[in-house]
A protein has these predicted regions:
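Conserved ABC ATPase signature
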Residues: 52-56, 60
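Conserved H-loop
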Residues: 105-110
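Conserved ABC ATPase "signature" region
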Residues: 32-47
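Hydrophobic anchor residue at the start of the ABC signature
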Residues: 66, 94
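Catalytic Walker B motif of ABC-type/P-loop ATPase nucleotide-binding domains
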Residues: 77-81
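Q-loop/switch helix immediately C-terminal to the Walker
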Residues: 8, 15-30
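Conserved catalytic motifs of ABC-family nucleotide-binding domains
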Residues: 73
């Protein structure tokens, strides 16, 4: 299973369906215990899941994207600037959480934040002016 967290969370959710409908459409049934645990760790309130994407802030919606990815239990997680809508402290907390909860999952991180990449990566491939370094 492959999950992806996009840079712009508004483009990763359909605008006319609630967040929970879209998560269940991909993940299927979700245990309340598991859902509540992730909600707590991501500092999300359950009532936000029943709203449509445009009713949430960018940071809230990005954390919903992360929630969806966690609930998928992927073997590989592709993340494109996953913390772009989050402040620095929350961004590092979210990456710590992803690494901890997805212990047996490969994570491919695309980021402009070299400090973040150095902090959380085993291997870094840097692209600069179309050259691989």
């Amino acid at each position: 299973r492959i999950a992806m967290i996009f840079q712009d969370p508004y483009n990763s959710f359909h605008p006319t369906y609630s967040i929970i409908e879209q998560i269940k459409d991909i993940v299927g049934e979700i245990s309340s215990k598991e859902l509540n645990g992730y909600l707590s760790k991501l500092s999300l309130q359950k009532d936000l899941l029943y709203k449509k994407p445009h009713e949430l802030s960018g940071g809230q919606l990005q954390r919903c994207s992360i929630l969806r990815a966690l609930l998928m239990k992927p073997d590989l997680l592709l993340v494109d600037e996953p913390t772009s809508a989050l402040d620095n402290i929350i961004a590092y907390d979210v990456m710590k959480l992803l690494i901890k909860l997805l212990d047996n999952c490969g994570i491919l991180l695309i980021t402009h934040d070299l400090d973040m990449a150095k902090w959380c990566s085993d291997k870094i491939i840097r692209l600069e002016e179309n050259a691989r370094k």
